[in-house]
Amino acid sequence: MNIGFKTRIYLGVGLLVTISLIVLGTLNILSMKEKMVTSLVNETQNKLSFHVTELEQLMQFRINAIATGAEQFDPSLSDADNQKLVNLLAKSTGISNVIMTYEDGRNYMSVESSNQFDFRTRDWYKTAKVASSVVLTDIYQDKVTGEKVVSATMPVKQGGQVVGVLLGDIQLGEIISTVSNMRFAGGAA
């Protein structure tokens, strides 16, 4: 079959246009893919930074609440006043359990328990007693609630002398739940 000159030109131009469109389309797809991946990575990093900051602020708020709360306790307070203070501190900060233990053995908890405890023998009490500021414990199983917790402890001082220790339990399950509920592009944490 004989193809005329005009037909050859038309076929050549058509082939060049087709090849050009395929090459440009492929380059465009690759470019868009790169931009989408970069955008997705940036968005995920921004959300992660936001959530990390949010968790840090929550923890810092609770640590500061224990530090500030320790200034309110005094061995001369009545049992009712001590109990009101630990309950108020727990409810207003979202701390799962607040415990105030005095050197004379009295203790007040925001979580009701029929058991009597001598918290002065606990490692967290001994560590906080010699500290000058808030101390965070390692993760441990709380004997009162049975939950895994991290505790913020602060010595309570009167006239420069330690008269007790204030503790606030932060449940590990709450932190894990908060992290699990974080949503990112394409899934969850």
Language model feature labels by segment:
Residues Y108-G187:
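Extracytoplasmic/periplasmic ligand-binding sensor regions of membrane-associated signaling proteins
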Residues I9-L15, F50-T53, R106, K148-V156:
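An N-terminal domain-start capping segment
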Residues Y10, N28-L58, I175:
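Juxtamembrane interface helices immediately C-terminal to a transmembrane segment
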Residues N42-V135, S180-M182:
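Extracytoplasmic/periplasmic sensory segments of membrane signal-transduction proteins
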Residues M1-E34:
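Extreme N-terminal signal-anchor transmembrane helix of membrane signaling/transducer proteins, especially
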Residues S20-L21, V37, N97, D104:
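Alpha-helical transmembrane segments of multi-pass membrane transport proteins
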